[in-house]
């Protein structure tokens, strides 16, 4: 995350901190007004620029030396990392989910009997409520990494070797998928589900905007493996950034309702769609392996990959009977308001 922090510092944060929290220089440091230049501020600064990576060098602007909080100040780093986590997360969410919604998501889903009234708006509101809270909990992990407590490395020479530059990607996916599988199963425990995970299962027929529409502690629990990985295993800095972008893209993709392939290895959109409608199957994030080992794998049926078949009213009616049974069994009652203004089956507590 120090690479991202350096980019944000160079183009945004240096200017903001210089303006809102300028350095107060003693009068005797500058004997004449002509000497009170930005260059002089650099000369009197104790902060020395060190690139976060050898692959990118960004010369700091003069404003980098003009704040009482220089780039190494932990409070400044914590605040900036919090804002990066929140705002960058929102940007990725809105850009990717919007593109997926416009170009991929099948709008016939709106006609599904279990599509909630004003669902897209509700998903966006839920995501916007969750992200700033998640950012508060997540930022300390990024701060520890920036402070050098993790196992992030820059070049091949700094890491285990060239072989690991390639091996780190499947290792990251397998480790995080294993951890998320068990975290996800825990979130479905009857004592936990209604408090943390029920919100995300409100969306039986999710749209791409449902990807981050969850309780903040739910989102943090399932993202925790991503954050602890670089404290346990070495991870190259640029790979770290790429993987975090990827996991956010993947979260949107598995909620877009476009079932491209019935792959027995990959836990794609079809598998995750079954998780939303069948609740206690397909807990994995990337692969089906841990669901198979844990006895929770449900293979998508062939009709799900036939576009017209999966959008047919006959298929919908057949499916919602099972969905409603599961809602009653797991949640006790259904307080969702569907597009037809009321659930087909009324439930009692």
Swiss-Prot record:
Keywords: Endoplasmic reticulum, Lipid biosynthesis, Lipid metabolism, Membrane, Oxidoreductase, Steroid biosynthesis, Steroid metabolism, Sterol biosynthesis, Sterol metabolism, Transmembrane, Transmembrane helix. It comes from Gibberella zeae (strain ATCC MYA-4620 / CBS 123657 / FGSC 9075 / NRRL 31084 / PH-1) (Wheat head blight fungus). It catalyses: episterol + 2 Fe(II)-[cytochrome b5] + O2 + 2 H(+) = 5-dehydroepisterol + 2 Fe(III)-[cytochrome b5] + 2 H2O. The histidine box domains may contain the active site and/or be involved in metal ion binding. The keyword Ligase does not apply. One of its GO terms (biological process) is sterol biosynthetic process. The lineage of its organism: Eukaryota, Fungi, Dikarya, Ascomycota, Pezizomycotina. The keyword Oxidoreductase applies. This is Delta(7)-sterol 5(6)-desaturase ERG3A. Pfam families: FA_hydroxylase. It is a multi-pass membrane protein. The third module or late pathway involves the ergosterol synthesis itself through consecutive reactions that mainly occur in the endoplasmic reticulum (ER) membrane. Firstly, the squalene synthase ERG9 catalyzes the condensation of 2 farnesyl pyrophosphate moieties to form squalene, which is the precursor of all steroids. InterPro entries: Fatty_acid_hydroxylase, Sterol_Desaturase_Related. A motif (Histidine box-1) lies at residues 184-188. Its main location: endoplasmic reticulum. Residues 170-296 form the Fatty acid hydroxylase domain. Disruption phenotype: Leads to a severe decrease in ergosterol production and virulence when ERG3B is also deleted. Results in increased production of deoxynivalenol (DON). One of its GO terms (molecular function) is iron ion binding. It is an enzyme of class 1 (oxidoreductase). A motif (Histidine box-3) lies at residues 272-276.
């Amino acid at each position: 995350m120090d690479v991202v922090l350096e980019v944000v510092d160079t183009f945004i944060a240096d200017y903001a901190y210089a303006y809102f929290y300028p350095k107060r220089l003693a009068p005797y440091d500058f004997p004449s007004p002509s000497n009170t230049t930005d260059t002089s501020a650099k000369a009197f600064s104790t902060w020395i620029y060190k690139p976060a990576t050898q692959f990118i060098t960004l010369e700091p602007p003069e404003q980098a030396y003009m704040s009482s909080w220089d780039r190494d100040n932990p409070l400044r780093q914590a605040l900036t990392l919090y804002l990066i986590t929140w705002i960058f997360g929102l940007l990725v969410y809105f850009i990717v989910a919007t593109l997926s919604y416009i170009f991929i998501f099948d709008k016939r889903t709106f006609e599904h009997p279990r599509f909630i009234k004003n669902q897209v708006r509700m998903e966006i509101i839920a995501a916007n409520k969750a992200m700033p809270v998640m950012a508060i909990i997540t930022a300390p992990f990024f701060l520890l990494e920036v402070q050098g407590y993790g196992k992030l490395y820059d070049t091949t020479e700094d890491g285990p070797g060239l072989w690991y530059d390639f091996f780190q990607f499947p290792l990251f996916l397998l480790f995080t998928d294993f951890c998320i599988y068990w975290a996800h199963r825990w979130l479905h425990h009857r004592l936990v589900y209604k408090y943390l995970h029920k919100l995300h299962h409100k969306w039986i027929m999710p749209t791409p905007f449902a990807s981050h529409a969850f309780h903040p502690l739910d989102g943090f629990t399932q993202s925790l493996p991503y954050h602890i990985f670089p404290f346990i295993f070495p991870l190259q800095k640029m790979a770290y950034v790429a993987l975090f972008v990827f996991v956010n893209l993947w979260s949107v993709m598995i909620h877009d309702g476009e079932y491209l392939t019935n792959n027995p290895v990959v836990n794609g959109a079809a598998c995750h769609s079954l998780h939303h409608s069948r609740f206690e199957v397909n807990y994995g994030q990337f692969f089906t392996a841990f669901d198979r080992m844990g006895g929770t794998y449900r293979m998508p049926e062939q009709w799900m990959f036939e576009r017209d078949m999966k959008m047919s009213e006959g298929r919908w009616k057949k499916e919602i009977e099972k969905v409603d049974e599961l809602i009653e069994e797991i949640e006790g009652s259904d307080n969702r308001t569907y597009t037809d203004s009321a659930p087909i089956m009324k439930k009692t507590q």
